[in-house]
Regions:
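Aromatic-anchored, charged helix-turn/loop surface patch used as a conserved interaction hotspot
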Residues: 1-21, 25-107, 153-165
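C-terminal non-catalytic interaction appendages of large macromolecular assemblies
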Residues: 93-165
Length: 165
């Protein structure tokens, strides 16, 4: 949809479009209430501002909607489609990469209690594996901040993509 179309949507429909970007109700409400936006960049900036900070509960809600890196999101929802597009650069045809991602995902989830989240768009599988390995050495507080930062980046990129369609 275009920015103009987004600006004119009824609030409930704008909120639904935003929830596909990040499943955080307060955030979607705040970005919806900020309309109309003069540019896609203004909308993305408002999305980043509304997401900083997100509460632990909001981060958990958004993380619950993200598949593991290297696993394709299932279903036909807008957020599943966005996730598949974002992970398109992760080559899962290489068995070694797939194995290393699966092992890293398991280790990460055991250590931190949630999926490993990274802005996958524009990153290779090797870059993602490098970050996964590095972030496994973080303490829980640092990693929570990393997850929240990546969620904010993903939400803003998804919104830009939605409003550029």
């Amino acid at each position: 949809m275009t920015l103009d179309e987004f600006n004119r949507l009824p609030p409930e429909q704008a909120r639904e479009a935003l929830l596909a970007c990040a499943h955080v109700g307060r955030w979607a409400d705040e970005v919806t209430a900020g309309r109309p936006y003069a540019s896609v960049e203004d909308a993305a900036r408002a999305a980043l501002d509304a997401a900083d900070p997100w509460t632990d509960e909001e981060v958990d809600a958004a993380l619950a909607r993200h598949p593991r890196i290297g696993e394709r999101a299932r279903g036909e929802s807008a957020d599943a489609s966005m996730s598949r597009s974002e992970q398109a650069g992760v080559d899962t045809s290489d068995d070694d990469v797939t194995r290393r991602l699966a092992e890293g995902n398991r280790a990460y989830e055991e250590r931190f209690g949630h999926v490993f989240l990274i802005r996958a768009a524009g990153r290779s599988a090797e870059e993602i594996l490098e970050q996964l390995t590095e972030r496994l050495g973080n303490d829980a507080e640092t990693e929570r901040a990393n997850a929240a930062r990546n969620l904010r980046e993903i939400a803003a990129l998804r919104l830009k993509g939605t409003l550029s369609a």
